[in-house]
Each structure stands twice: as structure tokens, then as C-alpha cells.
């Protein structure tokens, strides 16, 4: 399902006071700054095999929310995984953790928000959970929610 991106500040003005906005100051790394879509979730710690597997499937405009427990020790997304997301029709990836290949990520047509960068790559054991509620930045992301992202932040709406 494709969702039209919207300015988060305008969206907040419309739905206030029932606002769910992420308090983390995630940075933009992808080629798209404004993106939106239905939420798919994954929880993984310093291991990106599961999220690589998910992003290798058709995204149909969805946003993958990755709870990496805020770890900046290893990157969960780099240019290869971001390329998979773009090639498979994902609108974006929100990472509560680190990314790498920051210069290359800016050239890939997918939204990417993350805490920061680290050139160290993650392990590839496949550990983690998919399609579970994940919480960070004062927001609980539930599969099927709609995430709207832009320069001002992230707003989550339950359809």
C-alpha cells in the first residue's frame, strides 16, 4: 500500500493533541528526506541478517522500523542493504542504531533515518524478531501503523 508523504508539522497540527512523534533526533541519510508508508518492524541487536532478508522482499511502499536497541557499536544498514530496500520498493528505513556508507546512502532513492554512523558491520546470524511491537523515542511502532517522516521528525498514526 503506497502512502503519500506529508509534512509532519502539518500532520501534527491536524491531529493534535493525539500525536505520536518520535523524540529521538534521528538523522537523515538516504536519498529521500520525506517518506511515508505502512510500518513493518524488526528487532535485532548488532545483527543485520534478518533485516537484509526482509528488505530483499517486495516492500510495496512500506517503512521498515528497525529497533537495534540504540547501539552505535555496529551498523545495521549500509549501501548494499539500502540498495535492496530501494530496488524492492520500500519507502524507507528507520533505524534505532547506526548505519554506514553515509556518502553512498545519500545517492540511493530510499528514506533512511538513523541515530548515527559506524563503519563497523554487524554480525549475520539472523537473530531477531519480525513484526513485533518496538518502542523507542517515546513511541511504540506497531506493524500496520503509518509512519510519516521528514526533516522535522517522525509521526506515527494508527489507521
UniProtKB/Swiss-Prot annotation:
Entry keyword annotation includes Glycoprotein: no
EC number: 4.1.3.17, 4.1.1.112
Cofactor binding, note field: Divalent metal cation.
Cofactor(s) it depends on: a divalent metal cation
Domain of life, source organism: Bacteria
Keyword Metal-binding applies: yes
Catalytic activity as recorded in UniProt: 4-hydroxy-4-methyl-2-oxoglutarate = 2 pyruvate; oxaloacetate + H(+) = pyruvate + CO2
Binding site for a divalent metal cation: 101
GO terms assigned for molecular function: 4-hydroxy-4-methyl-2-oxoglutarate aldolase activity; metal ion binding; oxaloacetate decarboxylase activity; ribonuclease inhibitor activity
Gene Ontology biological process terms, A to Z: regulation of RNA metabolic process
Amino-acid positions noted as binding substrate in the UniProt annotation, renumbered to this chain: 78-81, 100
InterPro entries: RraA (IPR010203), RraA/RraA-like (IPR005493), RraA/RraA-like_sf (IPR036704)
Keywords associated with the record: Lyase, Metal-binding
Function: Catalyzes the aldol cleavage of 4-hydroxy-4-methyl-2-oxoglutarate (HMG) into 2 molecules of pyruvate. Also contains a secondary oxaloacetate (OAA) decarboxylase activity due to the common pyruvate enolate transition state formed following C-C bond cleavage in the retro-aldol and decarboxylation reactions.
Family note: Belongs to the class II aldolase/RraA-like family.
Subunit structure: Homotrimer.
Name of the molecule in the record: Putative 4-hydroxy-4-methyl-2-oxoglutarate aldolase
Species this chain originates from: Mycolicibacterium smegmatis (strain ATCC 700084 / mc(2)155)
Gene: rraA
Amino acid at each position: 500500500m503506497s502512502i503519500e508523504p506529508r509534512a509532519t508539522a502539518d500532520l501534527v497540527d491536524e491531529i493534535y493533541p493525539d500525536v505520536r512523534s518520535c523524540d529521538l533526533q534521528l538523522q537523515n541519510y538516504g536519498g529521500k528526506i520525506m517518506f511515508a508508508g505502512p510500518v513493518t518492524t524488526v528487532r535485532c541487536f548488532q545483527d543485520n541478517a534478518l533485516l537484509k532478508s526482509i528488505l530483499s522482499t517486495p516492500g510495496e511502499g512500506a517503512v521498515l522500523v528497525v529497533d537495534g536497541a540504540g547501539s552505535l557499536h555496529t551498523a545495521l544498514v549500509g549501501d548494499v542493504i539500502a540498495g535492496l530496500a530501494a530496488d524492492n520498493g520500500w519507502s524507507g528505513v528507520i533505524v534505532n542504531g547506526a548505519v554506514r556508507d553515509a556518502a553512498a546512502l545519500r545517492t540511493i532513492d530510499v528514506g533512511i533515518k538513523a541515530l548515527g554512523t559506524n563503519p563497523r558491520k554487524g554480525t549475520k546470524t539472523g537473530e531477531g524478531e519480525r513484526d513485533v511491537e518496538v518502542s523507542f523515542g517515546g513511541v511504540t511502532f506497531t506493524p500496520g501503523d503509518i509512519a510519516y517522516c521528514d526533516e522535522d521528525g517522525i509521526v506515527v498514526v494508527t489507521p
